[in-house]
Design a protein with these regions (language model features):
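N-terminal signal peptide c-region/cleavage motif recognized by signal peptidases
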Residues: 14-18
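Sec-exported extracytoplasmic/periplasmic mature domains
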Residues: 31, 35, 66-74, 81, ...
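Sec-dependent N-terminal signal peptides
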Residues: 4-13
Length: 188
């Protein structure tokens, strides 16, 4: 019995360490896009499926998240498409589509918000201690424009986590966590 309890404790500790390692790897993979993804281009593009991408030198905020997860063999293009097919009624109908579109669905913040609400842990929007490196955060910018980013391992001198995102000038690591209206905070 004691051996079993020790084994369970070791497993829980190992899984916690693995999650932290994956979170830091996600941050590092997002940072790899800084000074590489230098533009912002929201144009609709045909792309491969699965694992399709726009050219690495450009993209939008969602592409930062998608690319970082791909380095961990997590294909949000495929996962969002599968989940939308399974739970079409759960996803927003903001674009007038009647079915899924593998070229764009995963590149839309409201779709990623829905996916993370369904499959990730939702966390506090106000408790500063709840924001950990690798967490995903979504906002609404002025004119209700959706935005998404990844919490960095770096913080401001005041202790506020920086965010890795692309808001128009390529992938950046910046102090924007509380600059806009926060909508979602997820750990996946």
């Amino acid at each position: 019995m004691k051996k079993w309890i020790v084994s369970v404790i070791l497993l829980v500790v190992s899984l916690g360490t693995l999650a932290a390692t994956n979170a830091m790897q996600l941050v590092n993979d997002a940072k790899k896009q800084i000074n590489v993804t230098i533009g912002y281009d929201p144009a609709y593009r045909k792309m491969a499926f699965p694992m399709g991408d726009v050219p690495l030198h450009t993209g939008v905020c969602t592409d930062v998240v998608i690319r970082a997860y791909r380095h961990q063999q997590i294909d949000l293009q495929k996962l969002v498409n599968q989940d939308m097919k399974k739970a079409w009624s759960s996803y927003p109908k903001l674009w007038g589509l009647k079915s899924t579109d593998t070229n764009i669905d995963h590149r839309r913040v409201p779709n990623l918000e829905t996916f993370f609400q369904r499959h990730a842990k939702s966390l506090s929007l106000t408790d500063i201690t709840s924001f950990k490196a690798g967490d995903i955060v979504t906002w609404r910018l002025p004119r209700n424009l959706p935005h998404i980013g990844i919490i960095s391992d770096k913080k401001t001198p005041a202790g506020i986590p920086l965010v890795i995102h692309n808001i128009g000038a390529g992938t950046q690591e910046e102090d924007i966590l509380f600059k806009y209206k926060m909508i979602g905070h997820y750990r996946y």
